[in-house]
């Protein structure tokens, strides 16, 4: 991606520009780049507390170039608002006469930077970017603007990973003026051949540049990148004469390569006719390849709906690199921002005074029935807090928040939207560890907020929708344990689900109820006359206030009716003080005055909690759904949308409830059909959880199950196990248990979450379901092979390996006929079984065989494989290799998520070896992080490292109580999971640390035993028990110590040092300990000398320290 910098010699801008920017109202001025006609600075606008990029023109602008700049800004102004074109925030002239333009600052930099740092993009991500940029170019072309320099460096990435086209510094309104003959305004590697040959740029040349940009994203370099030492003219000749390199050789789908080739065709006539055509072709490629189909936002005229709506993908955003992921849980941006009011707000000073008096109390509770203006007041208070410098997050509660994990995920996301650096990795913890991580996440969040020393408030709107006790307990924990840096502002119908009593006793509660929320006459006058545009006499205002009991919703509906020509006197005669009567009367006075087409549209559009043009069109069976929504919004019909996501709409809850009641008059069959349409639209556009919800609401649970089953591999393979299990919980149990594929997906999710018992249950149900399913024999064989691999994983988790090879045989005999996750997991499982049989040399070829499949699984298979390599190397005393393997595994796991299960697994094993090599501090940090998250299962070697070595580290640090707690928890885990080898390790460590064992346990350990040699796990368990017996005897009288010495010698002699080097070394050290304990100092020194040398050579210093020999 090498390009000539045409401005390399223009770095002489007058140095007082930063001073002029400060004078213009900008702070923290920092130069970040040069291009176009000047320099780009990163600044802060104090008035809005936001970072911006300011582009300042250079000093040598002549009149024509100045006119060009101003024309550029007019073009940009006409394009502002498109989601994939950078918005122009301000244009002005500095004190020295230099024009400047202000745009949002993009901290994530450009697509070029992303590619340079992380390499080529996945083809699915590239298609997604291509569709969006095609929409941006089409929008520009429709207003007569050519970009002229589309390339990765001119595509910036928003904080949400969305691409935005920028730098129209060489763009101009078509026909405005011509660039001097022979001057190429653009980057050669991305410029169309005809432009290089002297032709004027056209929309077709922008299409070529878009294709060249996508080629670069797919390969990591330009199609005609300038070679080392190559002259520019030679590069031009290659671009104009040679075909582009064949992308099929990169392993890309043929239709992906063909689409790029057509966009980069040598002759303009052979390219797609418009940028929109490019976008539609890329969408067709997405559809054929079974990936999520992106929408291509284009400007539309009122009443005209284009072929595909622009909003279907708006809530399905993802990061700028890698494969797109389904959000967890999938949520619209509207959830994290108060809805934009349909009219002006009324200032309610008496209520904000109450809130202000609440100071920094942990909870501000605003509670009243629907329609009292709770959310509006919270939004106003949010604005006031923001002006005072607080960071204020917003979270609107919906039914999905009745799942504790999803609620916490939403809470973290809302906070990250106002403080992106807070809780960066905690969301991933929730996804992988589910319910177990709740307390850890909340504690970590409280600590981070406190340590950040920054005031944060979170508005939690509509809390009454939560009935789940675990979710309520989570919020209660946050309120009980939070600090005064964090304040929660909760709106709800009541006080239910909140620890109001405790907070009131501690003076941590400020409260506003329905009595306070009711409008008084002055406030009602402001609402009806000032904001509502009416001219009601004071007497009528007072009468309306009295008859509505100051209910904000009723007053708003009354204003709407009166603006439509209603008579105030007649309106007042029809009102009573009962809220239900007011609600029904005023709602019908609004709805029944509408034309039938609009009334019918509002009824059907209310079926879903949120809607957009495409969805509303599908529900109503029309093509202009977006125009109808905009018309309803324009007429103030209680339809709201947010500033940052204008494509999605939501009805005011009270009005939506009324519409639902009216809709139900048409019969349940009609409502069910609308839910079916909604389910179909959501499923087609990639919103699984909403598709499932509406299928269930339609009374079609079979379709809901089908939807999840069809999507069964996507969520687990993206490590969205908790999301999958939460969605499955919504489905009828009787239907879930009868679906073989779905049970297999549930088993995968539970295995990946380290939950062997639920996984085994799912596998058992799988067999029953498969026996009843009418599937082709080949399909059944594939599913059984996959299930057997999962059973093998469950076996090794249970510390049994006898059946593992048989269970893996089918999958390992035909790996290429199965999904990559199956042979990839099989290879890891076979390797772990080999370790348990002391066949360490066999581990490496097994993992080499599995590696190609693990690369297609994502990072998790690679993390496990590196851990297994490290375990084999450690047992062979190849300490250098083991450390490298564990470090690699930890680095890859941490890249997935700092608190991911993969990182913690690798971290525990790395910590064990760090401890043995003397790095107590490093081992302690890793062990503490692993221990806090908890785990329901896993291989015994991982659990032993976590509990046993974790306890040993605590003891070495002087925390004997912490060590005992670790061992106690480990002992409970061993009993619960039925793991004798783990129990033996726990008992052995208790003896080492001087923790007394129950008499019966000690007696069993002291009894003579024969160590089996035909089963590796039984061998290790018996050896641990014999080690424990030796240590117990060593603490006794002289006769016992002599017996200990004899048994230790026999134990060491029985271990084959060539086959099991580490075990042999550990047994030798134990024998030396007993020799010293019996007073045989000379013998002990003689045996210690070679052992000490070996430990020093290997760096295993801690082995001798723990034995008291160093």
Curated annotation (Swiss-Prot):
Q: Which GO terms describe its molecular function?
A: ATP binding; identical protein binding; metal ion binding; protein kinase activity; protein serine kinase activity; protein serine/threonine kinase activity
Listed binding positions for ATP are: 32-40, 55
Q: What happens when the gene is disrupted?
A: Deletion affects cell size and cell wall composition, increases survival during persistent infection in mice, and increases resistance to acidic pH, hypoxia, oxidative and stationary-phase stresses in vitro.
Name the PROSITE patterns on file. PROTEIN_KINASE_ATP, PROTEIN_KINASE_DOM
Name the positions where Mg(2+) binds: 154, 167
Q: Which residues form the Protein kinase domain?
A: 26-283
**InterPro entries per the record?**
AAA_16, Kinase-like_dom_sf, P-loop_NTPase, Prot_kinase_dom, Protein_kinase_ATP_BS, Ser/Thr_kinase_PknK_prd
Output this protein's name.
Serine/threonine-protein kinase PknK
Name of the coding gene: pknK
């Amino acid at each position: 991606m090498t390009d000539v910098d045409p401005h390399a010699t223009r770095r002489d801008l007058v140095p007082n520009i930063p001073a002029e920017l400060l004078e213009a109202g900008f702070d923290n001025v920092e130069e970040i780049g040069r291009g176009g006609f000047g320099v780009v600075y990163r600044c802060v606008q104090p008035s809005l507390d936001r970072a911006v990029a300011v582009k300042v023109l250079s000093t040598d602008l002549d009149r024509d170039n100045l006119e060009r700049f101003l024309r550029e800004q007019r073009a940009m102004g006409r394009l502002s608002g498109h989601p994939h074109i950078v918005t122009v925030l301000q244009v002005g002239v500095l004190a020295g006469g230099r024009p400047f333009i202000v745009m949002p600052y993009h901290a994530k930099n450009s697509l070029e930077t992303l590619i340079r740092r992380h390499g080529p993009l996945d083809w699915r991500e590239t298609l997604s970017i291509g569709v969006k940029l095609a929409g941006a170019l089409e929008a520009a072309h429709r207003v007569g603007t050519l970009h002229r320099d589309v390339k990765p460096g001119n595509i910036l990435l928003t904080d949400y990973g969305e691409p935005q086209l920028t730098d129209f510094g060489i763009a101009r309104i078509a026909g405005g003026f011509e660039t001097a003959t022979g001057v190429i305004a653009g980057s050669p590697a991305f410029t169309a051949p005809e432009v290089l040959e002297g032709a004027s740029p056209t929309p077709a040349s922008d299409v070529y540049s878009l294709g060249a940009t996508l080629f670069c994203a797919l390969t990591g370099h330009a199609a005609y990148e300038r070679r080392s030492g190559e002259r520019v003219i030679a590069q031009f000749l290659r671009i104009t004469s040679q075909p582009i390199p064949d992308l099929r050789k990169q392993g890309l789908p043929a239709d992906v390569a063909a689409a790029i080739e057509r966009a980069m065709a040598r002759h303009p006539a052979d390219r797609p006719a418009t940028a929109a055509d490019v976008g539609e072709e890329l969408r067709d490629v997405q559809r054929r390849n079974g990936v999520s189909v992106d929408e291509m936002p284009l400007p539309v005229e009122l009443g005209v709906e284009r072929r595909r709506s622009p909003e279907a993908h708006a809530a399905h955003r993802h990061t700028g690199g890698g494969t797109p992921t389904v959000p967890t849980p999938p949520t619209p941006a509207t959830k994290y921002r108060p809805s934009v009011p349909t009219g002006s707000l009324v200032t309610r000073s008496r209520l904000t005074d109450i809130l202000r008096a609440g100071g920094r109390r942990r909870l501000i509770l605003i509670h009243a029935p629907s329609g009292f203006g709770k959310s509006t007041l919270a939004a106003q208070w949010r604005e006031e807090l923001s002006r005072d410098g607080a960071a204020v997050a917003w979270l609107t509660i919906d039914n999905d928040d009745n799942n504790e994990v999803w609620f916490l995920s939403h809470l973290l996301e809302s906070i990250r939207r106002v403080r992106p650096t807070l809780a960066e990795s905690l969301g991933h913890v929730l996804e992988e560890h589910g319910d177990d991580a709740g307390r850890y996440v909340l504690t970590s969040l409280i600590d981070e907020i406190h340590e950040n020393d920054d005031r944060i408030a979170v508005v939690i709107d509509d809390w009454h929708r939560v009935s789940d006790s675990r979710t309520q307990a989570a919020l209660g924990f946050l309120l009980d344990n939070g600090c005064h840096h964090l304040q929660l502002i909760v709106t709800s119908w009541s006080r239910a689900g909140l620890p109001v009593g405790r907070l009131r006793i501690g003076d941590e509660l400020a409260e506003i109820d329905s009595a306070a929320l009711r409008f008084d006459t002055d406030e009602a006058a402001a609402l009806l006359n000032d904001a509502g545009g009416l001219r009601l006499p004071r007497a009528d205002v007072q009468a309306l206030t009295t008859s509505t009991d100051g209910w904000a919703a009723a007053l708003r509906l009354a204003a709407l009716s009166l603006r439509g020509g209603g008579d105030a006197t007649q309106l007042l005669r029809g009102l009573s003080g009962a809220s239900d009567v007011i609600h029904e009367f005023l709602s019908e006075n609004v709805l029944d005055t509408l034309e039938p087409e609009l009334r019918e549209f509002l009824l059907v559009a209310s079926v879903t909690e949120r809607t957009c043009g495409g969805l509303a069109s599908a529900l109503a069976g029309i093509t202009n759904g977006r125009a109808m929504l905009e018309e309803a919004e324009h007429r103030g019909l209680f339809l709201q949308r947010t500033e940052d996501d204008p494509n999605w709409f939501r009805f005011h809850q009270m009005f939506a409830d009324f519409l639902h009641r009216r809709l139900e008059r048409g019969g349940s069959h009609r409502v069910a059909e609308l839910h079916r349409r909604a389910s179909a639209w959501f499923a087609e556009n990639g919103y699984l959880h909403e598709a499932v919800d509406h299928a269930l609401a339609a009374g079609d649970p079979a379709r809901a199950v089908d939807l999840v089953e069809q999507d069964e591999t996507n969520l687990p393979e993206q490590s969205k196990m908790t999301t999958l299990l939460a969605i499955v919980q919504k489905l009828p149990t009787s239907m879930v248990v009868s679906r073989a594929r779905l049970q297999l997906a549930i088993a995968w999710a539970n295995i990946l979450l380290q939950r062997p018992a639920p996984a085994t249950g799912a596998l058992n149900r799988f067999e029953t379901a498969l026996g009843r399913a009418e599937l082709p024999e080949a399909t059944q064989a594939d599913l059984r092979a996959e299930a057997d691999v999962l059973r093998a994983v469950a076996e090794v988790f249970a510390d049994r390996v006898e059946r593992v090879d048989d269970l893996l045989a089918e999958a390992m005999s035909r790996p290429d006929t199965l999904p990559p996750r199956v042979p990839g997991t099989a290879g890891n499982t076979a390797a772990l079984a080999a370790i348990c049989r002391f066949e360490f040399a066999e581990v490496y070829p097994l993992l080499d065989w599995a590696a190609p499949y693990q690369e297609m699984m994502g990072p998790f298979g690679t993390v496990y494989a590196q851990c297994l390599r490290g375990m084999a190397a450690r047992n062979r005393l190849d300490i250098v290799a083991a450390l490298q393997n564990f470090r690699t595994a930890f680095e890859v796991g941490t890249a997935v998520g700092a608190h991911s299960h993969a990182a913690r697994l690798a971290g525990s094993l790395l910590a064990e070896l760090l401890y043995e090599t003397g790095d107590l501090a490093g081992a302690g940090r890793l062990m503490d992080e692993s221990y806090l998250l908890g785990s329901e299962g896993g291989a015994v070697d991982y659990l032993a490292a976590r509990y046993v070595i974790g306890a040993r580290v605590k003891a070495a640090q002087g925390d004997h109580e912490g060590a005992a707690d670790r061992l106690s928890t480990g002992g409970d885990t061993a009993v619960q999971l039925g793991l004798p080898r783990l129990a033996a390790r726990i008992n052995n460590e208790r003896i080492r640390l001087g923790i007394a064992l129950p008499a019966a346990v000690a007696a069993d350990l002291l009894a003579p035993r024969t160590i089996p040699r035909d089963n590796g796990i039984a061998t290790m368990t018996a050896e641990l028990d014999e080690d424990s017996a030796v240590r117990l005897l060593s603490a006794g009288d002289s006769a016992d110590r002599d017996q200990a010495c004899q048994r230790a010698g026999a134990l060491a002699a029985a271990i084959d040092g060539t086959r099991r080097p580490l075990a042999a070394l550990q047994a030798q050290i134990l024998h030396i300990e007993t020799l010293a304990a019996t007073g045989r100092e000379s013998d002990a020194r003689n045996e210690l000398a070679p052992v000490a040398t070996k430990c020093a050579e290997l760096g295993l210093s801690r082995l001798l320290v723990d034995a008291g020999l160093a």
